[in-house]
Amino acid sequence: MDVTNILLKPVLTEKSYLNQMGELKKYVFAINPKATKTKVKLAFEIIYGVKPLKINTLIRKPVTIRNGTKYPGFSKLAKLAVITLPKGMDIAITGEKTTKKETKDQ
């Protein structure tokens, strides 16, 4: 599987923005349903140049959607990865430059 086919796109919602404001930055990405945590970690390191602290994955299963006709529709299957970065690290998703904040170790 190619690196560009693992991380499909960032998921930008209100909840994902709130996770980015904390001390440990958490970013949510839509990923290939066949991707594993190790492949996601390698792809993230290659693309963004930052080693993630933790990766959680979840599968959003298809649900029935009413569309006003006799036959119901279904939403798409989606696999998401919540990637936690180490303290003081940050990445740019929306086109901003990546910054590394220096922290004082005590």
Swiss-Prot record:
NCBIfam families: PRK05738.3-3. Belongs to the universal ribosomal protein uL23 family. It comes from the Bacteria. One of the early assembly proteins it binds 23S rRNA. One of the proteins that surrounds the polypeptide exit tunnel on the outside of the ribosome. Forms the main docking site for trigger factor binding to the ribosome. Keywords: Ribonucleoprotein, Ribosomal protein, RNA-binding, rRNA-binding. GO terms for molecular function: rRNA binding; structural constituent of ribosome. This is Large ribosomal subunit protein uL23. GO terms for cellular component: ribonucleoprotein complex; ribosome. SUPFAM superfamilies: Ribosomal proteins S24e, L23 and L15e (SSF54189). It comes from Mycoplasma genitalium (strain ATCC 33530 / DSM 19775 / NCTC 10195 / G37). GO terms for biological process: translation. Signal peptide: none annotated. Part of the 50S ribosomal subunit. Contacts protein L29, and trigger factor when it is bound to the ribosome. Pfam families: Ribosomal_L23. The gene is rplW.
